[in-house]
Amino acid sequence: MNIRKAIPSDLIEIMSIYSIARDFMIESGNPQWGHSYPPEELIQEDIENGACHLIFDEEGVHGVFALFDGIEPTYQHIEDGKWLNDEPYVTVHRIASDGKAHGIFKCAINYCKGISDNIRIDTHKSNLIMQKQIEKNGFQKCGTIYVRESPRIAYQWSNKY
């Protein structure tokens, strides 16, 4: 698997992957993204800002995620715990797969580990599959943050712990 930054012409394929992921989430009882998240405008913004990344192989694109460097506003306040450290970090958002390839999450996280010593990510309490992937890849549960007034389980990976 390889990773590259998305370009505007990738938008249709990216939105297709998000549609597949939303359907899977709903089928597995996870309401986190509903029927319309993430909206196309947000993905266009991620592409323009260089945050949107694609995971692909010789058969095509199988995954997408957004990677942000710097302070994540929703992580400024954490309840029921604390972050592992206050050092600079990158944040992974909106990771999704087309379901046709294995190891999408691990591939994305390994890429991120090559960029930063600290990675933060969050997920919905109903997203049991993502919780398992996050924990399997060495992240520690740190507490609860809020996204659009909805609680999320917050995790951090640091190469110092």
Task: State what each model feature region is.
Residues D122, Q140-A154:
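Conserved catalytic-core motifs of GNAT/GCN5-like acyltransferases
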Residues T91, G114-S126:
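Conserved GNAT acetyl-CoA-binding A-motif
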Residues N2-S16:
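A short beta-loop-alpha structural element at the N-terminal edge
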Residues R22-L42:
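Conserved GNAT-fold acetyl-CoA-binding loop/helix
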Residues S126-G143:
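Conserved active-site alpha-helix within GNAT-family acetyltransferase domains
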Residues L54, G60-G70:
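Conserved beta-strand in the GNAT
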Residues S97-G114, Q131-K136:
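Conserved acetyl-CoA-binding loop-helix of GNAT-fold acetyltransferases
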Residues A66-K100:
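Conserved acyl-donor/pantetheine-binding loop and adjacent beta-alpha core of acyl/acetyltransferases
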